[in-house]
């Protein structure tokens, strides 16, 4: 089933909308948010400083109307190793975890080396892995071997999975993802309720072996 919601300050008013919707059912959901990226006036701006990291998490807590966020990921600008090695963002997230404001932290990155270092120093990595792109598989393998978390982004190749005629791209995608022991969950985005219902049914069939 679905029990994880992926959001971020850079996703418009997503957090503000989720706050009221979670009222009365907060315990049923795992919330994932981000730090590092702000989307303002149609452009992304990145800030991985300690001050902005703490500000961003505190703001997300208020917007989501909650006292903790299960997982906060660093929204990488593509320079994964530089972010992890030369900014204060990971150390600040570790402190926020000690304070109980977040329960886990990691990186939504773009490179294998970044994903591996993110797992070595943190709890989770969000990686691209689908029928078309599997370059980050070493990160999944590391997570499986070391008990770390993996969330998959672009799980359905943004809807453009290319297969042979007659193949169900959604089912084939889920079989690939959930066939790997390192995968904790997949982020599936849609604005179509029918697509959502169909995707959930397909994922359930794959997970139960039907």
Question: Predicted regions: what is each one?
Answer:
Residues 28-41, 74-75:
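A short, structured active-site edge motif that brings together acidic residues
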Residues 1-33:
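N-terminal binding-site loop/beta-alpha segment at the start of enzyme catalytic domains
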Residues 5, 69, 105:
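Glycine-centered flexible beta-alpha turn that most often forms the glycine-rich phosphate-binding loop
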Residues 15-25, 56-64, 137-145:
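Short amphipathic alpha-helices and their capping/turn segments at secondary-structure boundaries
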Residues 21, 76-210:
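Beta/alpha (TIM)-barrel catalytic core signal, keyed to glycine-rich beta->alpha loops juxtaposed to Asp/Glu
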Residues 38-54, 80-82, 161-167:
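Active-site mouth loops of central-metabolism enzymes
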Residues 52-75, 95-99:
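CE4/NodB-like, metal-dependent polysaccharide N-deacetylase domain
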């Amino acid at each position: 089933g679905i029990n994880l919601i992926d959001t971020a300050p850079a996703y418009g008013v997503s957090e503000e909308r989720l706050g009221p919707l979670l009222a009365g059912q907060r315990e049923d959901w795992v919330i994932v948010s981000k730090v590092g990226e702000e989307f303002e006036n149609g452009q992304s701006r990145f800030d991985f400083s300690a001050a902005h990291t703490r500000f961003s998490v505190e703001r997300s807590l208020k917007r989501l109307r909650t006292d903790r966020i299960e997982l906060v990921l660093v929204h990488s600008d593509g320079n994964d190793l530089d972010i992890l090695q030369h900014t204060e963002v990971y150390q600040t997230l570790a402190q926020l975890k000690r304070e109980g404001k977040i329960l886990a932290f990691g990186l939504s990155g773009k490179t294998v080396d970044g994903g591996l270092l993110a797992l070595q120093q943190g709890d989770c990595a969000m990686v691209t892995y689908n029928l078309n792109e599997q370059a980050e598989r070493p990160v999944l393998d590391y997570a499986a071997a070391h008990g770390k978390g993996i969330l998959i982004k672009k799980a359905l190749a943004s809807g453009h999975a290319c297969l042979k005629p007659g193949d169900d791209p959604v089912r084939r995608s889920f079989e690939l993802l959930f066939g790997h022991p390192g995968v904790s969950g997949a982020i599936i985005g849609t604005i179509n309720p029918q697509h959502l219902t169909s995707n959930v049914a397909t994922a359930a069939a794959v997970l139960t072996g039907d």
